């Protein structure tokens, strides 16, 4: 019973909470117990808010019983990457020198979660200061991949992907500047979603600390969940006035066939290419028009902010003139081993960075597993000899999250790759 609840989707658990068949108090206790049991191995959380979460759960239970239901996230346990300021709770960015940094105000997205009634369990670990893609460098220790700790979890939102994959919480709010949410989602076999630039507020990411203005133009809030519909639910709760789940085109809104561009970069490894090819066959079966497409893999130097703004307008006018969604692998290789990842940028963001540069919505969904020999598995489960997840990335027009999420959800429903790792973590 407990395992079923830990891996339930937000839509399911939210309905159970609203109907008072599951209490937020019991659910939070289950999650905290699981964190206490598994976090010593995973190191997914830097800070766990036992007392605060239980108090919030009691308030949520009282409100829901009294008919004051706030929506689909009310009473749902979530976590936030330790990049976002949380009033009265330390925010470290995985940087040991920030271990006593306690903000006085919530980041906008944290405040939005609170308004939605979500229960904050704690702050997730990350590659320190967001400056790496492996998840191995943090002032609070490396995060471990819940599928196999001999392999990296990806970064910089490493703790979030590990926490969601291990059933410690139902969703996390993250950041994504070069793929920081999508890369670890692909490594850990979960969903990583980055909305369009400007659709979710970034205010309150280490507020008051020095930051590179060009990097801020690339930084997007991200959402990690176990399913596409869950990502859409969280997005609806935290998006600002620019973020919408209304389709941007008449074709997408009506449900008629849309054009999906297939863009596999030449740098993909053989294992990734095999899984990608199988995924594309599934995409064809969805009934939409599939064509070849050139994705903007070559990102210009981004020192001039005026250049970024102009390029974003160009891609909106030209790159998506012929297609509605572009599909490509999330990673260029299979998940790297820890011993091969001494460089903090060992996991290449070559397939993810351009979505940040151009401000486009993008999502990574599971599309298969490698076998212990590195062979992509076409079946519905990881191989018995240590399969690692492989991610499929979909990218859409700016501010057309609705079409992107609809296509990703249809693919997910047609494949249903497992998102429950074989805990305790195997190591080989």
Annotate each language-model stretch with its function.
Residues 1-54, 284-288, 420-428:
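An N-terminal boundary/leader segment
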Residues 12-15, 19, 33, 125, ...:
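Serine-dependent amide/ester hydrolase catalytic core
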Residues 13-19, 97-101, 219-226, 394-395:
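Short, well-ordered beta-strand elements within core beta-sheets of diverse protein domains
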Residues 37, 165-266, 277-282, 286, ...:
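Structural helix-boundary/capping segments
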Residues 43, 170, 324-326:
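Conserved acidic residues
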Residues 53-61, 117-118, 127:
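Long amphipathic alpha-helix in the N-terminal Rossmann-like dinucleotide-binding domain
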Residues 73-221, 263, 330-343, 372, ...:
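Short glycine/serine-rich loop/turn segments
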């Amino acid at each position: 019973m407990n395992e079923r609840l830990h891996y339930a989707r937000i839509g399911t658990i939210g309905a159970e909470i609203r109907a008072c068949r599951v209490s937020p108090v019991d659910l939070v206790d289950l999650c905290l117990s699981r964190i206490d049991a598994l976090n010593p191995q995973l190191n997914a959380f830097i800070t766990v808010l036992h007392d605060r979460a239980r108090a919030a759960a009691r308030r949520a239970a009282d409100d829901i019983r009294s008919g004051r239901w706030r929506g689909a996230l009310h009473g749902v346990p979530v976590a936030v990457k330790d990049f976002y300021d949380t009033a009265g709770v330390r925010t470290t960015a995985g940087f040991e020198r920030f271990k006593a940094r306690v903000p006085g105000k919530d980041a906008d997205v944290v405040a939005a979660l609170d308004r939605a009634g979500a229960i904050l369990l704690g702050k997730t670990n990350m590659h320190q200061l967001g400056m790496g893609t492996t998840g191995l460098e943090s002032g609070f220790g490396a995060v471990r991949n819940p599928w196999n700790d001999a392999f990296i979890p990806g970064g910089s939102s490493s703790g979030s992907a590990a926490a969601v994959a291990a059933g410690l919480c139902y969703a996390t709010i993250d950041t994504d500047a070069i793929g920081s949410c999508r890369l670890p989602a692909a490594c850990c076999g979960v969903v990583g979603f980055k909305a369009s630039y400007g659709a979710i507020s970034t205010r309150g990411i280490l507020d008051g600390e020095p930051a590179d203005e060009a990097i801020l133009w690339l930084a997007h809030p991200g959402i990690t969940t176990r399913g596409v519909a869950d990502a859409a639910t969280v997005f609806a709760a935290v998006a600002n006035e620019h973020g919408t789940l209304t389709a941007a085109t008449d074709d997408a809104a009506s449900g008629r066939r849309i054009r999906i561009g297939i863009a596999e970069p030449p740098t993909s490894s053989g294992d990734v290419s095999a899984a990608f090819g199988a995924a594309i066959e599934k995409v064809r079966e969805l009934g939409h028009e599939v064509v070849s497409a050139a994705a903007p893999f070559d990102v210009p130097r981004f020192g001039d902010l005026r250049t970024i703004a102009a390029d974003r307008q160009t891609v909106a006018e030209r790159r998506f003139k012929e297609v509605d969604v572009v599909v490509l692998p999330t990673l260029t290789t299979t998940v790297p081993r820890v011993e091969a990842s001494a460089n903090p940028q060992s996991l290449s963001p070559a397939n993810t960075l351009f979505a940040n540069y151009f401000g486009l919505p993008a999502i990574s969904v599971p599309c298969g597993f490698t076998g212990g020999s590195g062979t992509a598995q076409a079946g519905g489960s990881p191989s018995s000899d240590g399969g690692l997840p492989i991610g499929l990335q979909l990218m859409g027009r700016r501010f057309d999250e609705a079409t992107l999420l609809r296509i990703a959800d249809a693919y997910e429903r047609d494949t249903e790759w497992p998102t429950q790792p074989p805990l305790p973590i195997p190591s080989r």
